[in-house]
Amino acid sequence: MKKSTLINSGISYLVATLGHTDEITICDAGLPIPDHVQRIDLALTHGVPSFLDTVRVILSESQIEGVIIAEEFSDVSPVLHEALLKELSKESEETGKSIEIKYVSHEAFKARTEQSRAVVRTGECTPYANVIFQAGVVF
């Protein structure tokens, strides 16, 4: 059995095969997922697993250099938005690498998911709890 934090085989494979600048979307239970993009559906029930728990686990296994977030997230769900920024800041401090944060409209965010290698759907039911991770390099 795998010893590290991430034991989901689909996400583990995805992270292992990411190239520089590839994108992964982590989303709430309601975000539409394009038909042609791989769907990794973790949602069990409302709030399980949570958006933040999923973000933390994926960050523990992958190097990112940027994120894309919907502008509406900070206005509509400020507590969870701040918690996400805190996790990104912590990751940046631990790795010594900066993480660029880009804000776009929710409509532009949904369109951008078309470029994702995969969309990881959580059970989160907080509005706009979505983020796109852009893969970085570990060297």
UniProtKB/Swiss-Prot annotation:
Substrate binds at residues 28, 106, 128-130. It is found in: Cytoplasm. Its main location: cytoplasm. PANTHER family: D-RIBOSE PYRANASE. Homodecamer. Belongs to the RbsD / FucU family. RbsD subfamily. This is D-ribose pyranase. It comes from Vibrio parahaemolyticus serotype O3:K6 (strain RIMD 2210633).
